[in-house]
Amino acid sequence: MKDINNIDFSIIRERALRNIREDLIAEWSHEFPADEIGEAFDYVLKLHRDGATLDHFIPVLVEAEMSARLRSGNLWPATAA
């Protein structure tokens, strides 16, 4: 019997981040180049990873920030540059 308490959540987080990236590109590539969305995603992900005390919520935070940037029409706000 497998120990259900021995779960590697980092794999789950990485899969979630990959899916979020792919979904954002699919949804917004008609307004922004896919590579630009990917670069902004990587930047936002790095910001959250560098500042995280607990990494469990990084996918949710990255998705929320990227969605806000995409909706605003500005992937690179002046405060982020």
Language-model region placement:
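Charged, amphipathic alpha-helical regulatory modules used
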Residues: K2-A81
